Amino acid sequence: MRAQAHHAHAPARRAPAPNIPACGRGDVVLSLVSPRSWYQRGRWPLFGVDAVSTGTRPCRFNMGSRFATVVVSSGRTRIWGSADCVPGAGSQSVVLSRGVPAVRWIYWDRATSVPGCRRPGRPVHQGAYAAIAFDGQLASQVMVVLLGHPGSYLP
């Protein structure tokens, strides 16, 4: 089994011209959203990488599959990354305007992965996992995602 990120893209404006400057590091806030905090057996977690400009002018931001990514971990162990098995450049430049979010939706197939897909993924067990959005410089807050029935986590 090869662990993959399955991408569902929200409409975003592609950069119409190269004269729009790239967003500065302090001009973008990255967050991670999900419609659920727990996913029953057989359901794939859905993550939204959400980028919002806080700058005063429109700017270009890379929302591509190799740039605006999600990483899932358990404790200190890295479990899965949305960019691990992405072929090609994975670049998609969008224009961000102040306060208007651009979102890229990503499904996790509940399997492990490693950068470059150097070994087959394995299904993960039910439990609590930490997820974070990352673009190489910016990181979101950590989100906890539960796999399995929520009652199974009670002592």
Q: What residues fall within each predicted segment?
A:
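Primarily secretory-pathway and cell-envelope proteins
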Residues: M1-S97, F134, L138-P155
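Residue-level preference for beta-strand/loop junctions
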Residues: R43, V100, H125-G127
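Intrinsically disordered, low-complexity Pro/Gly/Ser/Thr-rich segments with frequent PxxP/GP/PP motifs
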Residues: C85-P115
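Short acidic/polar inter-strand loop motif in beta-rich domains
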Residues: A111-C117, Q137-Q141
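Short glycine/proline/serine/threonine-rich loop/turn segments at secondary-structure transition edges
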Residues: S113-G127
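A short tyrosine-centered beta-strand micro-motif
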Residues: G127-A133
